[in-house]
Amino acid sequence: MAMAAEQWVLVEMVQALYEAPAYHLILEGILILWIIRLVFSKTYKLQERSDLTAKEKEELIEEWQPEPLVPPVSKNHPALNYNIVSGPPTHNIVVNGKECVNFASFNFLGLLANPRVKAAALASLKKYGVGTCGPRGFYGTFDVHLDLEERLAKFMRTEEAIIYSYGFSTIASAIPAYSKRGDIVFVDSAACFAIQKGLQASRSDIKLFKHNDVADLERLLKEQEIEDQKNPRKARVTRRFIVVEGLYMNTGTVCPLPELVKLKYKYKARIFLEESLSFGVLGEHGRGVTEHYGISIDDIDLISANMENALASVGGFCCGRSFVVDHQRLSGQGYCFSASLPPLLAAAAIEALNIMEENPGIFAVLKKKCQHIHKSLQGISGLKVVGESLSPALHLQLEESTGSREKDVQLLQEMVIHCMNEGIALTQARYLDKEEKCLPPPSIRVVVTVEQTEEELERAASTIREAAQAVLL
């Protein structure tokens, strides 16, 4: 039976071949021959290659123009025209051999030259040596690190804290530790560069809202809510984060935290709060923007800050609930893969915290001086003050731009030089122009510390006024 069936199939095939149109047979034959040619033919023929003559080679070499190793840089670039500082950047700073009152360094509480902080750092140096020579997970954890984390958690009234060896890497590591590809981050358009790098590393979907504009943020949250309703399955695994600064580095303004907390609960998002500028500045005890507004620390999912401003040390920290902080010990790249904070800097930060707790009146003094300089800088012809009266870092921008960023920077730099010649050390706010997501206008940054006297504040304001008249008018 099987042989009969095979013969019948063969007969059908032959019959179909006879009945097929001629053009169909020709086309199939051509395709078969083409396939055979492709299988057995070489990709190229050696005899078809033609070598260039010596003359043609020389012509190609002469025509070739290599790309520059580095992009062209103006001779006026600040990196090529730097100031040389002799000694520590304390209240009085020596710049290019001239002593000035320091209005440029973020030494808000004046702890950089504090004898107690120096003594604590020196004692730690004698006990532990200079560095740890390893990350926290590889014999880089010293008892002083654990003491500092415990003190920070207690000071901020959170369950746990984690320290990083570099302030910039703190928030830049914390964001990608939680927010991943597919998650959505709503971030203020004035966010600092460290936040921007953290968002870039997270590969999340970034949605910018207008600076401190709660209505614009809610608009974006509503739009996302509508999108989530279209695809509930995807929405269930998509996390939503709101990333803001307590006191913005680029604008000197305080975030509207109470309204943000309301939106957090309404739209089921998480809040990451960067407090590098507000920690040790805002609040009755210097705990930052949460204390300033009287908001429970439990309403914020993660708080980060560096220790290079108010604490006059190096590094940064994150604090919050234990399960949130513990995750960073496994996923925070700046924590896992960087050498841990030198013990002497951890000891210095602990002593700085001791001083802050023993002398809470220092924050009221700083606030008063911030308000003083903010008022004194008003009404300078050609300049506008950007920042709130609570901010120890204010920006002076041109009232009217020349139309060229390079010329604006040059005018402001002439003012900085004029002030330096008069004994007032200022600096321009520096940005990586091509890297910034929303590049702020050029500005002179004025930094207030508790060490500056009222006479020095008035002198700085009058010197800036004179510089504006000399350069801008």
UniProtKB/Swiss-Prot annotation:
Phosphorylation at Tyr-164 inhibits activity and promotes cell survival. Its cofactor is pyridoxal 5'-phosphate. Residues 37-473 are cytoplasmic. The gene is SPTLC1. It comes from Cricetulus griseus (Chinese hamster). Component of the serine palmitoyltransferase (SPT) complex, which is also composed of SPTLC2 or SPTLC3 and SPTSSA or SPTSSB. The heterodimer with SPTLC2 or SPTLC3 forms the catalytic core of the enzyme, while SPTSSA or SPTSSB subunits determine substrate specificity. SPT also interacts with ORMDL proteins, especially ORMDL3, which negatively regulate SPT activity in the presence of ceramides. Forms dimers of heterodimers with SPTLC2. Interacts with RTN4. SUPFAM superfamilies: PLP-dependent transferases (SSF53383). Its EC number is 2.3.1.50. Gene3D superfamilies: Aspartate Aminotransferase, domain 1 (3.90.1150.10), Type I PLP-dependent aspartate aminotransferase-like (Major domain) (3.40.640.10). Residues 1-15 are lumenal. Pathway: Lipid metabolism; sphingolipid metabolism. GO terms for cellular component: endoplasmic reticulum membrane; serine palmitoyltransferase complex. Belongs to the class-II pyridoxal-phosphate-dependent aminotransferase family. This is Serine palmitoyltransferase 1.
